[in-house]
Amino acid sequence: VKMKAKTALDKGISCILKTQYVQNGKPTVWCAQHDEKTLLPANARAFELASLSGQESDDIVLFLMSLSKPSPEVVNSIEAAVEWFRQNEIDGYKIENFKNSDGKKDWRLVKCAEGEESKPLWARFYTLEDNRPFFCDRDGVMKFDVSEIGHERRTGYSWYNSEALKVFKKYEQWSKKYGKNKTEGN
């Protein structure tokens, strides 16, 4: 049973490494969905277009960092993903909740006031070509401003989060043990 579990884990890790999206020759993060046969980025529901995921990817990186003896390939994968999160961090903005003109709960992304503290944010979806945050309604049309999608999808889906902060926190300890120059001999 132990051997079967190890084989299954190794296959899963191999799949994770194969699905890390390569953009302009550089590994990034993972897509929200991948085709089950080709492993390429894929659409899911109408509002879930093929995209890089600023949400699903953080759990993948946390899982990879939990491995007790990461291979050089896993180390490189983690390093590339952490770098992508750093480069695509959205600073100086916050989520503002409000009641819209219909009296319904709503939200918007607003620029922080000078000197105001805010957590960095990451979008749920980024374009595959150039890492632009985007949003989508049930019509399947990509929008670059969340206010352009309907209230139901805007408020019924998690479009921004700060979960990558967990990645950065764990990476601090992980990199001391396994970072780029620490894997010789593993």
What is the predicted function of each stretch?
Residues 1-27:
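Beta-propeller domains
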Residues 4-11, 37-42, 48, 52-186:
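Terminal, non-catalytic domain-edge segments
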Residues 29-36:
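Short, surface-exposed glycine/acidic/tryptophan-bearing loops
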